Curated annotation (Swiss-Prot):
Glycans are attached at residue 333. The record marks 339 as: Necessary, but not sufficient, for proteolytic processing. A motif (D/ECD-tripeptide) lies at residues 427-429. This is Zinc metalloproteinase-disintegrin-like jararhagin. It comes from Bothrops jararaca. CDD domains: ZnMc_adamalysin_II_like. Residues 363-449 form the Disintegrin domain.
């Protein structure tokens, strides 16, 4: 859909302030546009009545979604849509208030009311379906085992989650088929979720929205196990092939069994199937639903439900097993530790890259610390900005500054040509250096795939030198080595663990010449162990423990799609 010639999109200021009264006392609300809400290549998908898929790329340079605070209240927060009047919530003196326009003709009057005065459809406690004994996708270490080094604290940047939301047909029906209303609500929810995760030093950017306006693409059932697995499989085999993203959630109008209103896999962020959650759209209050969305995404980041020893001050915490009567947007100390433990130990690589401004579909907001369309920099709110190069109020560079962001920016100037900006990760990955003409580090370049490495023990593959010894060490630790060739014959069985690849869900046994491109076998010589054919297998992730692509399987040969092929023709 294109805008008619001459039509002008409404202009929403980067920063605004409003004055009104709460409990008879004047308050000043300061708002800053959330410029990291949408990516530049944000796309929306819905379906025509005849079933055709319709993809649009709405303009996102200007939008009306803001974060903010109340003047003279350091603990205050706000998440507001200013599209048609002010709609959203703010916290003032530890109380949650909602604001929305009164539906009166020719009037700009608004209603302000406390959360406790909102009519609630059902007072029964609502809860997440994940139980404490529910098996993690990856084990989470005890909090006492986590320790950040000074180097890690210095160089660990913000993480960026490219978020995709899918809305089921039941939600479309509940909203009388009004797609614009649904989109506006999804933007408001994403704005709140992004604000919540900033407390964990993460940014959540909406990169896509799909509305099942002509029928669900999976069978959505009250059984959360069934629906979560179905959505995860659809995401892996369908959605990911069409749109790059890190994490997806299904928002559904169906009433899940029992008091459950959300469900997700634990420790699965970046997994092609399991980086998902499902959320019941059970409340008309955006804050309530956004907290559930943040809660389920927290599980994907390795965070378990809070126990009695966890705290986030005097507020209820995001990861409590039940949804509080007055939900807050704070993660507990336990959540922070578990999240960063998961990131540091399991390295979910998809959340390292900052999304292109063109990837974020929600409208840009100045002050959300995401660099988006129209911004030269974004260092957060004026109160929190610690970037001397950036004007936080406008998201423009200060006079005399060449840059305010990037690995090749030092003291607001481009780094000198030749300055190393990305270290070598292996002999197959040379270091990159600044050009002196840009604040960004040049693209990561690798040596050619198939080039010999590690004294001919391996061949370069996508910047790494994969060899079986290193893979055994990663799985089992020290004193573990590549097993004898006889162990690999088990891969000819085609059973639950011994195979070379999967085709249409079926495990294909290895041909004799391909056995070293299936399950990895290691010889364990560690104290108390004497296992000549040790292997790793997990129902949660069947692929883990397989020989990695590009690994040397014979002289002059490497693994490719479960075959041991000539390195000269593999790439």
């Amino acid at each position: 859909a294109t805008r008619p010639k001459g039509a002008v999109q409404p202009k929403y200021e980067d920063a605004m302030q409003y004055e009104f009264k709460v409990n008879g006392e004047p308050v000043v609300l300061h708002l800053e546009k959330n410029k990291g809400l949408f990516s530049k290549d944000y796309s929306e998908i819905h379906y025509s009545p005849d079933g055709r898929e319709i993809t649009t790329y709405p303009p996102v340079e200007d939008h009306c979604y803001y974060h903010g605070r109340i003047e003279n209240d350091a603990d205050s927060t706000a998440s507001i849509s200013a599209c048609n009047g002010l709609k959203g919530y703010f916290k003032l003196q530890r109380e949650t208030y909602f604001i929305e326009p009164l539906k009166l003709p020719d009037s700009e009057a608004h209603a302000v009311f406390k959360y406790e005065n909102v009519e609630k459809e059902d007072e029964a406690p609502k809860m997440c379906g994940v139980t404490q004994n529910w098996k993690s996708y990856e084990p989470i270490k005890k909090a006492s085992q986590l320790a950040f080094t000074a180097e890690q604290q210095r160089y660990d940047p913000y993480k960026y989650i490219e978020f995709f939301v899918v809305v089921d047909q039941g939600t479309v029906t509940k909203n009388n088929g009004d797609l614009d209303k649904i989109k506006a609500r999804m933007y408001e929810l994403a704005n709140i979720v992004n604000e919540i995760f900033r407390y964990l030093y993460m940014h959540v950017a909406l990169v896509g929205l799909e509305i099942w306006s002509n029928g669900d693409k999976i069978t959505v059932k009250p059984d959360v196990d069934y629906t979560l697995n179905s959505f995860a499989e659809w995401r892996k085999t369908d959605l990911l092939t069409r749109k790059k993203h890190d994490n997806a959630q299904l928002l559904t109008a169906i009433d899940f069994n029992g008091p459950t209103i959300g469900y997700a896999y634990i420790g699965s962020m970046c997994h092609p199937k399991r980086s998902v959650g499902i959320v019941q759209d059970y409340s008309p209050i955006n804050l309530v639903v956004a907290v559930i969305m943040a809660h389920e995404m927290g599980h994907n980041l390795g965070i378990h439900h809070d126990t009695g020893s966890c705290s986030c001050g005097d507020y209820p915490c995001i990861m409590g097993p039940t949804i509080s009567n007055e939900p807050s947007k704070f993660f507990s100390n336990c959540s922070y530790i578990q999240c960063w433990d998961f990131i540091m130990n399991h390295n979910p690589e998809c959340i390292i890259n900052e999304p292109l401004g063109t990837d974020i579909i929600s409208p840009p907001v100045c002050g959300n610390e995401l660099l988006e369309v129209g911004e030269e920099c974004d260092c957060g709110t004026p109160e929190n900005c610690q970037n001397e190069c950036c004007d936080a109020a406008t998201c423009k560079l200060k006079s005399g500054s060449q840059c305010g962001h990037g690995d090749c920016c030092e003291q607001c100037k481009f780094s000198k040509s030749g300055t190393e900006c990305r270290a070598s990760m292996s002999e197959c990955d040379p270091a990159e250096h600044c050009t002196g003409q840009s604040s960004e580090c040049p693209a990561d370049v690798f040596h050619k795939n198939g080039q010999p490495c590690l004294d001919n023990y391996g061949y370069c593959y996508n910047g790494n030198c994969p060899i079986m010894y290193h893979q055994c060490y990663a799985l089992f630790g020290a004193d573990v080595y590549e097993a004898e060739d006889s162990c690999f014959k088990d891969n000819q069985k085609g059973n639950y663990y011994g195979y070379c690849r999967k085709e249409n869900g079926k495990k294909i046994p290895c041909a004799p010449e391909d056995v070293k491109c299936g399950r990895l076998y290691c010889k364990d010589n560690s104290p108390g162990q004497n296992n000549p054919c040790k292997m790793f297998y997990s129902n949660d992730d069947e692929h883990k423990g397989m020989v990695l692509p590009g690994t040397k399987c014979a002289d002059g040969k490497v693994c490719s799609n479960g075959h041991c092929v000539d390195v000269a023709t593999a790439y």
